[in-house]
Amino acid sequence: MKIQGLKLTQFKNYDSGQFVFSERLNCFVGKNGMGKTNLLDAIYYLCMCKSHRGVNDRNVVKHSTEFFRLEGYFLNEKKIEKKSKSKIKIVAKVQPGKNKEIEKDDVAYQKLSEHIGMIPVVIIVPDDTLMATEGSEERRRFLDNTLSQLDGDYLKNLITYNKILKQRNSALKKFAETRSFNAELVDI
């Protein structure tokens, strides 16, 4: 899968932008703060339904604006299914008061997890050196993101695991506050 084009609207430091990519090699050159990493983050967002920095969607909307929209065009070189198209359009929209929406060829996904792995992507940025020097949390997040793209069952199990972990931690917090378990907490 190769990216062919990208349109950004009110994403991070971009009011709007339109990019056409070479099939071979693309280089982004500019001074600090010009948006090179934000451009890469937009591509990542279209593939993973989130920013690579793990921030809330509100934090990727351009300052003092209400929404953002990303539109990416990809070339599917491995037409796995006979009916699959060679060109794919992915749109990501975040608007106030609405759920995030990801569309493939103008059809919205019911669950964002259905999209993960459609366009495999790995991003490595200078801060990722922390994976080697800091704790295991960053390494685990990197591996989870990568493996989730390769194996849909892994992603489903990861979502379930994180949900159960959140419930367990909430139950332990309630227990610490009340010093008692009730039937609801025991089920968790």
What are the language-model segments listed below?
Residues 20, 38, 59-62, 156, ...:
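Alpha-helical initiation/capping and key positions within long helical/coiled-coil segments
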Residues 36, 40, 57, 143-144:
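Alpha-helical structural signal
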Residues 43, 47-51, 172:
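Short amphipathic alpha-helical segments enriched in hydrophobics
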Residues 48-133, 137-138, 147-154:
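Nucleotide-state sensing region of NTPase/ATPase domains
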Residues 130-188:
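An accessory alpha-helical subdomain
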